[in-house]
Regions:
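N-terminal pre-domains immediately preceding structured catalytic cores
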Residues: 2-5, 9-220
Length: 220
C-alpha cells in the first residue's frame, strides 16, 4: 500500500499539469486603428447641395490629412479676417481671434509664385468665367487655345465654384484664389493657375470673407 502512494501522487501531479496546459488565457483584442479622417471631415468634403452646378464629394483617400481645413495655432501680427497665403508650404490661413487661424491646403500654380505682397479682395464671384492667360496659351496651345475667348462658369471650369480677385491700389494684380475641379492637386505644385482650393474649401472661405478683406501673399 505504501509503495503505491508515490505513484498515485505522481499521476495526480501529471494530470494537473496537463489540465493547466489545456487552459487558454483570454487575449484582449487589439484596438482598431484610428480612422485617418473624422466624421466631420467626411461631412465637410461631401457633395455640396444647393449649387447651380454639381460639386461632387472629395475622395479623402487621395489627400493628406494636413491639407484638410482645420483650426490651428498661428502667430501673426495680422488682424483677424486677414487672409495669409503661404505658397512655399502650400497653405492658406484665415486669421482668427486668440492666436489661431483656419488653415486650408492649397495647390500652387506658376502664376501663384509670380507675385507677393499685400492686396485686398476687390471682387468675389460664384462660378466665375475663366480665360487662360497668353502665357498659358503659348505654353500649352493644344490645351488652352480653344478657350482664348473665355469659358463660362461651370463644373468643368478651372476656377471652380468660387474666385477671389486681388487688387492693390485699385489695380488688378492678376492674382486669384479660386476653386478647382482637380482636388487631387491640393498640396502640390501645378503647371498653371494661382492659388487653388478644393471647391468645398473655397465655398467656405467665400462665405467668411468680405470684399475689401486684406490678403498677404508670402514669397514663394
Amino acid at each position: 500500500m505504501a509503495s503505491t502512494l508515490p505513484a498515485r501522487g505522481l499521476a495526480a501531479v501529471m494530470l494537473a499539469a496537463l489540465a493547466a496546459g489545456c487552459t487558454t488565457i483570454a487575449q484582449r483584442p487589439e484596438p482598431a486603428p484610428a480612422p485617418r479622417f473624422s466624421a466631420l471631415d467626411v461631412e465637410r468634403y461631401g457633395a455640396v447641395a444647393g449649387e447651380p452646378f454639381h460639386v461632387p464629394a472629395v475622395s479623402l483617400e487621395d489627400l493628406r490629412p494636413r491639407n484638410l481645413r482645420q483650426l490651428v495655432e498661428y502667430g501673426t501680427r495680422e488682424a483677424p479676417g486677414t487672409i495669409v497665403v503661404d505658397p512655399k508650404h502650400r497653405f492658406l490661413y484665415l486669421v482668427q481671434e486668440g492666436g489661431k487661424a483656419l488653415r486650408y491646403g492649397v495647390g500652387v500654380g506658376r502664376e501663384g509664385l509670380a507675385w507677393s505682397g499685400s492686396a485686398n479682395v476687390a471682387t468675389k464671384r460664384a462660378w466665375p468665367n475663366w480665360t487662360p492667360t497668353p502665357d498659358m496659351i503659348r505654353r500649352e496651345p493644344g490645351k488652352y487655345a480653344k478657350w482664348a475667348g473665355g469659358m463660362s462658369g461651370g463644373a468643368d471650369n478651372p476656377l471652380g465654384a468660387r474666385a477671389l480677385y486681388l487688387f492693390k491700389d485699385g489695380r488688378d494684380t492678376l492674382y486669384r484664389i479660386h476653386g478647382t475641379n482637380e482636388p487631387e492637386t491640393i498640396g502640390h505644385a501645378v503647371s498653371s493657375g494661382c492659388i487653388r482650393m478644393m471647391n468645398q474649401d473655397v465655398i467656405d472661405l467665400y462665405r467668411r470673407v468680405s470684399a475689401g478683406a486684406k490678403v498677404v501673399v508670402l514669397p514663394g
